[in-house]
A protein has these predicted regions:
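Short acidic, glycine/serine/threonine-rich loops at helix termini
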Residues: 92, 110, 117-122, 153-154, ...
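Glycine/serine-rich anion-binding loops at beta->alpha junctions
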Residues: 77-116
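Well-ordered secondary-structure scaffolds
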Residues: 5, 10, 15-18, 28, ...
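A glycine-rich helix N-cap at a beta->alpha junction
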Residues: 123-149, 219-229
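Alpha-helix C-terminal capping segments
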Residues: 47-48, 93-107, 187-192, 227-228, ...
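Phosphate/diphosphate-binding glycine-rich loops and adjacent basic-rich segments that engage nucleotide
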Residues: 144-193
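Acidic, glycine/proline-rich low-complexity segments that act as flexible tails and inter-domain linkers
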Residues: 1-88, 260, 308-319, 444-445
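Short beta-strand segments
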Residues: 109, 143, 151-153, 184, ...
Length: 445
């Protein structure tokens, strides 16, 4: 079938023959189909969606467009976590070495930030020398030596996704559940993971604004991943408030290191343990959820996870001095505070506004080729439920450009809501989704 016929079928919301869809994707990855035709197809998909079989076929074809990794020679199978992105989400930096220190094998292929949500690679690159461009051979060596690696997608790993991701970014076709599903899963499956835990976020600081949107995406990814032979589970987590107390690249690395040293914020530790327990269960570590969390707690508070992170940083070329003494990480030239306008209790923190303030300061990028400022952002965020007196600091703002400071300060100041009545934060983890509890209208395997 010629490309324009496939595009027309999707435009008219008709089913595409699966062999033709697969050939279309593989031809695009080889350069035989131009960007303008794939852009038209992506827009038609964004408008009309895909059925389950089409989504599964798209995912498999994108995975098969390049090389695939295999870790079958290791005693345990490879397991990973993927987050749909949020404000202050530095979980991967803590989770990968934590699970590895409990016997897991974690080859984590991560991405860069775009817009308000930060990228794991940008955060790690605030450690001088840290390499995020490992080849497949280098990746395997790091995993073999320390049990975990956090690196970027290579040109040979799911290249169809790499091309389509860049195209979606500039054609208004990001918000499509089938395209998001195929993008995430093709990379993870190509990286050789046999177990995957998804952190699907909802709320003001995430891509999916409602629980319903997050659930649809989570259920689709669980169903497609399971069909592809991967054990997949998802947690729906609240991103109406920032995660932890810091937003920004080096600031989040600092907080992650402190967490690995046993001094992290409670919400970050809670989410890390929840995801880590599911990863350990997938690789066959015996025990119920409480037992697995206890194993993770022992690895964290004994220092084993920190030592594993330090080893990973060394193996990937990073200077360990910046981990052993994280105060050496890049710092901003100006640090200011946001004072509380009145006394009471903090009852809300708008994650989107906090993320936008950090973005204005230079912590994020508008275009993929833009540079980020590692040093800027927001730290020492007060959290929901905490008491404040008038004039108390609600957050510290870290800036290098004076022209951005005032705009960010005003935006950040408007993100806090104080009331005389005490209010506890809503539950961080909304629900768990597995292949056994998918909605009736989800096509399972």
């Amino acid at each position: 079938m010629i490309p324009q016929d496939i595009i027309a079928l999707k435009r008219d919301d008709e089913a595409i023959p699966l062999d033709d869809l697969r050939a279309f994707v593989l031809d695009y990855s080889k350069g035989d189909i131009p960007d303008y035709q794939m852009a038209a197809f992506a827009m038609a998909t964004c408008l009309n969606g895909m059925n389950f079989e089409e989504t599964a076929t798209l995912t498999q074809a994108m995975m098969d467009s390049g090389e695939t990794l295999n870790f079958s020679e290791f005693e345990t199978f490879a397991v990973d976590k993927h987050s749909t992105g949020g404000i202050g989400d530095k979980v991967s930096l803590v989770l990968a070495p934590l699970v590895a220190s409990c016997g897991g094998l974690v080859p984590m292929i991560s991405g860069r930030g775009l817009g308000l949500t930060g990228g794991t690679l940008d955060k790690l690159e605030s450690i001088p020398g840290y390499r995020t461009d490992l080849s497949s051979i280098e990746l395997r060596k790091v995993v073999s030596d320390c049990g975990c690696v956090i690196t970027g997608q290579t040109d040979r790993l799911a290249p169809a996704d790499k091309k389509l991701y860049a195209l979606r970014d500039v054609t208004g076709t990001v918000s499509s559940v089938p395209l998001i599903t195929a993008s995430i899963l093709s990379k993870k499956l190509a990286a050789g993971v046999q177990g995957l835990v998804l952190d699907v976020k909802f709320g003001s600081g995430s891509f999916m604004k409602t629980v319903g949107e997050a659930r649809e995406l989570a259920e689709t990814m669980v169903a497609v991943g399971t069909r592809s032979g991967c054990r997949v589970e998802a947690l729906l987590t609240d991103m109406n408030r920032p995660l932890g107390r810091s937003v920004g690249n080096s600031l989040e690395v600092f907080e992650a290191v402190r967490t690995l040293q046993g001094e992290g914020p409670a919400d970050l530790v809670e989410l890390t343990f929840a995801l880590g327990a599911r990863m350990l269960a997938m690789i066959g570590v015996p025990g119920d959820d409480d037992t697995l969390r206890a194993l993770l707690a022992d690895a964290l508070y004994s220092g084993r996870a920190f030592e594993r992170f330090l080893k990973m940083v060394r193996l990937q070329g990073g200077d360990p001095a910046f981990v052993e003494s994280p105060e050496k990480l890049p710092t901003a030239s100006t640090i200011d505070t946001i004072p509380a306008p009145n006394a009471g209790y903090l009852i809300a923190v708008d994650a989107e506004k906090v993320g936008r303030a950090a973005f204005i300061l230079g912590a994020g990028r508008t275009r993929r080729e833009d540079a980020v400022d590692f040093a800027v952002g927001v730290s020492d965020l007060k959290q929901i439920g905490e008491p404040v007196a008038k004039g108390d600091s609600l957050a510290r703002i870290h800036a290098n450009a004076a022209e951005h400071l005032e705009e960010a300060r005003v935006l950040l100041g408007s993100s806090f809501l104080i009331d005389t009545s005490h209010s506890e934060p809503t539950a961080l983890i909304k629900e768990k989704i597995t292949n056994s509890n998918l909605s009736a209208d989800t096509f399972s395997s």
